[in-house]
Every structure is written in structure tokens, then in C-alpha cells.
Design a protein with these regions (language model features):
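A short, proline-enriched helix->beta-strand linker immediately N-terminal to the Walker B motif
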Residues: 57-61
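C-terminal boundary and immediately downstream tail of ABC-type ATPase nucleotide-binding domains
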Residues: 130-155
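H-loop/switch region of ABC-family ATPase nucleotide-binding domains
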Residues: 99-100
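Conserved ABC ATPase signature
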Residues: 38-42, 46
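Helix N-cap at the start of a conserved alpha-helix in ABC-type nucleotide-binding domains
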Residues: 74-76
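Catalytic Walker B motif of ABC-type/P-loop ATPase nucleotide-binding domains
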Residues: 63-66
Length: 155
């Protein structure tokens, strides 16, 4: 029902086609076996994948993800990042991700915009991040030891 909602609201397809599309989207996020479960019966990571399936149900040109990894363990966060990246590439969707997870930014970001106190402070590619001179950006992005190590290796 969750994935069917946008199809029921905004699609003129037959019920059979809407069900087929919903099942396709659930299968795409590896949740076809959970299609009969209620939200309270699935994990946080599965709930995030349902949200992605619902978001792609209408074949959008744009996908907006607000903190897609919040509340998830590192392994599940990586699964969500890979899923967002794969779907973005596979369906040629422009995806905007709002996140504080710098590992995610550096893992799936192509173009990065750093916003500080509501203003765009820096913009560039993830490769350009390694050479950025903006101190606030560097302090924020490279706060984790893992990313500090990656930066050193890219010098």
C-alpha cells in the first residue's frame, strides 16, 4: 500500500499495471518478500528502502533524500548509499541528498554543496574537496579519522 500510494494518486494506469509497478519497485530495493508487512514489522533500513521504492514509483526525474541514513547502523547506511547511487545511475535521476553523514557524501556525491548557517559556503566535486582551502569545510568533512586518511592518500 505504501508504494502504491503515489501510483493511486497520480497515475492513470490500470490497477493491474499499478500493482505490477509497485512490485517492480519493491523488487528493485530487495523487499518483494516484505510486501505484505506493516511498517512496524520491518526494520529501519527496510523502511528507508520502502521510502525509496515509493519515491521511484512514478519514474521521477528528481529524487530528494533528506537524511537517508539517519538512525541506521553503518552497514545499513552503506546499503542505502549504494541503493541511492545505483538507482540514480540506472534510471538517470538527478538526486539531491541532504545529509550530515560525510562518509555518505564522499561515497555517493558527484557535486557537493556545503551550506553553513543557511548560506552556500562552498561548491565543487568530491575530488575538489581534497584540495579545498575552506577551513570550515575541511573541519566538517574530515572530522572522521577514515576520511582524514583518505585525504592524506589523495594528496
Amino acid at each position: 500500500e505504501n508504494v502504491m500510494f503515489p501510483l493511486d494518486m497520480f497515475s492513470n494506469d490500470t490497477l493491474r499495471d499499478r500493482i505490477r509497478r509497485a512490485r517492480f519497485c519493491l523488487d528493485r530495493v530487495n523487499l518483494i518478500d516484505a510486501q505484505k508487512k506493516y511498517p512496524g514489522e520491518i526494520s529501519g533500513g527496510m523502511q528507508k528502502r520502502v521510502a525509496i521504492a515509493r519515491a521511484i514509483a512514478l519514474n521521477p526525474q528528481y529524487l530528494f533524500c533528506d537524511e537517508p541514513n539517519s538512525g541506521l547502523d553503518p552497514k545499513t547506511s552503506l546499503v542505502i548509499d549504494e541503493l541511492i547511487h545505483d538507482i540514480t545511475t540506472e534510471y538517470n535521476i538527478t538526486t539531491i541528498v541532504n545529509t550530515h553523514d560525510m562518509n555518505s557524501v564522499m561515497g555517493i556525491g558527484d557535486s557537493i554543496i556545503y551550506i553553513y548557517q543557511g548560506h552556500k559556503e562552498w561548491e565543487g566535486t568530491k575530488d575538489e574537496v581534497f584540495n579545498a582551502t575552506n577551513q570550515r569545510l575541511n573541519d566538517f568533512i574530515f572530522a572522521s579519522d577514515l576520511l582524514k586518511k583518505v585525504k592524506e592518500e589523495n594528496k
